[in-house]
Regions:
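Short loop/turn microsegments at loop-to-beta-strand junctions
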Residues: 40, 156-157, 209-212
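Short, surface-exposed glycine/acidic/tryptophan-bearing loops
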Residues: 184-187
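Short, well-ordered junction/capping motifs at the entry into regular secondary structure
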Residues: 189-218, 246-247
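Active-site microenvironments of metalloenzymes and redox enzymes
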Residues: 52-59, 72-181, 226-234, 307-324
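N-terminal pre-domain segments of enzymes
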Residues: 15-35, 315
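Surface-exposed recognition segments
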Residues: 58-71, 174-175, 197-200, 218-324
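Hydrophobic membrane-insertion alpha-helices, especially the h-region
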Residues: 1-9
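Mature N-terminal segment immediately following signal peptide/propeptide cleavage
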Residues: 37-52
Length: 324
């Protein structure tokens, strides 16, 4: 009996990390100041190594997706959906500044430990879309501040996913062109894009999820990630073996958005495809200087939240998605 116990223990200790780290998914619930409860699912993503980027032979491949390189990703949680208007409105209402940004003098909110929230949006923040559609039109800075608010609201540390985490999760253990294989004709089952979206966003989680239970990774809205954009950013990792994931580069001027949107072509929905903030994204903002919070006419930019798996994890539900 003792021998059996020892053998089982040795197997566990020497098993691949991703087999030992099947942390459980959980439901997060946020309660607004008026008592409304809003819940969302956080999927546990096991650690692993994957090939990031695309080969030159891949249709639609761009120079900034090369060279391909191996990246080691630590286990983390990722929201199964894009952040919804419903949840983003709670953040906006609890933290929004009452003094305009143009003065350079923003008022802190007392609601959530004095987080400086966004200035009032020019126009309608929802752009006329219902609550369950993805929130959109926020800058990277605004998305980051939302994560700070959510962390204080829940007591758990939320953040944006790194670019490598995002691609790893989108691929869901595969190496195909799209999250659903290599056939672009299959995208209509998984994504809202130019072929089926009718030029607008749609309620989250209405299409099929990928094999890790994540909805709308391609399409609907582009998603901000943590990283700054560098067109040569992959070059430094080539030929080194698997590099440990970290946001790259350490600094810069513009950030990366992944996944394509409701108006994107199939090529823009490839798992390796990258987009980055451009000056014209701010053209709809009449303020001078331009707001650091809003992209008023960019209804195609959103985000989803991530969390590192660590000792403060509050796990309330068994993992629902299995690696296939």
């Amino acid at each position: 009996m003792l021998v059996v116990i020892i053998l089982v223990a040795c197997y566990y200790l020497n098993a691949p990390r991703q087999d030992r780290e099947q942390a459980r998914s959980y439901t997060e619930t946020v309660t607004s100041t008026n008592g409304r409860k809003i819940s969302f699912e956080m999927a546990a993503i096991a650690s692993g190594t994957f090939v990031m980027g695309s080969p030159k032979s891949e249709p639609g491949s761009k120079n900034d997706e090369r060279p391909q390189h191996e990246v080691q990703v630590e286990p983390f949680y990722l929201c199964t959906t894009e952040t919804t208007i419903e949840l983003f409105l709670v953040y906006y209402q609890e933290t929004t500044s009452t003094i305009t940004e143009v003065t350079g003098d923003e008022q802190n909110s007392d609601d959530i430990d004095a987080i400086t929230g966004p200035t009032p949006v020019y126009g309608d923040m929802t752009m006329g879309y219902p609550d369950k559609h993805p929130a959109m039109g926020m800058t990277w800075h605004n998305a980051k501040t939302f994560c700070e608010w959510l962390s204080k609201k829940t007591g758990r540390t939320y953040r944006l996913p790194t670019e490598a985490e995002w691609e790893y999760a989108c691929r869901a253990g595969g190496g195909d062109i799209f999250c659903c294989g290599n056939d672009p004709n299959q995208l209509v089952d998984f994504a809202w894009y130019e072929a089926d979206a009718d030029g607008e966003t749609h309620e989250v989680a209405q299409k099929k999820p990928n094999t890790w239970g994540l909805y709308d990774m391609p399409g609907n809205v582009r998603e901000w990630v943590e990283d700054f954009y560098d067109p040569q950013g992959y070059s430094g990792d080539s030929g080194k073996g698997a590099t440990v994931d970290s946001p790259k580069p350490a600094d810069g001027k513009v950030h990366v958005a992944r996944g394509g949107d409701f108006d994107s072509s199939a090529e823009e929905l490839r798992s390796a495809a990258r987009a980055f903030e451009e000056e014209w994204w701010r053209f709809g903002d009449p303020q001078i200087p331009k707001s650091r919070w809003w992209l008023p006419q960019m209804d195609c930019i959103g985000f989803r939240v991530a969390r590192s798996i660590d000792s403060d994890s509050k796990i309330v539900k068994e993992q629902k998605h299995a690696r296939k």
